[in-house]
Structures are given as C-alpha cells and as structure tokens.
Amino acid sequence: VYRNGKSKANRCFVMIIKKNDASSNRIGISVSKKVGNSIVRHRVTRVIREVMRLHWKEIKSGYDIVIVARPSAKESDYGKFESAIFHLLNLHHLLLEDDDLE
C-alpha cells in the first residue's frame, strides 16, 4: 500500500489507499513515537478505530486503507478526528452516495 497506493493528507492524518481484490476493506493504523508517548499513541489509535467502526458502512468496499497519524493529532478531540477522516475519505472518493447506502 505504501509503495503503490494513492496518498492524501490533512493536518492530522495521511491516508493511503489501494484497491484490493477482496470484497471488503482492510484498515491499517500507524501512530509513530513522534505523536507522543504510548498512552497518547494508543488513545489516537483507539479513536481512529472507533471512527472507522462507526462509519464502516458508509465507505466503498474493496480497498486497503492505511491511516498515518501526524504529531498534531495528539491535540485533537473525537470531533476533529471524525471530520479529518471524513475529509480524507471524501478526497479519495471513498464515501458512498446517499442512495448507495443499504
């Protein structure tokens, strides 16, 4: 995914996507030591995972998605995480249209 994927970024995250041959999505989350100590890194990881879990059905299937947290992510709250992730999903055209849901 890192080598051949398409990358988009905003202040909090870098999102890299690549089409896969599966019918479902796979997600990877990377939070380096630059973001903070282990407590901060695990919090960032948990919040990213929760945002993706709650909105999983709104994302087109068949992609490998890697989310890399930037150091500015440690200062963000859940609302900023959610809007930043949706911004990147929208840039990658991965959000389903309203009529495609269900």
Q: How should these model regions be labeled?
A:
Residues 1-102:
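Positively charged, solvent-exposed patches that mediate nucleic-acid binding
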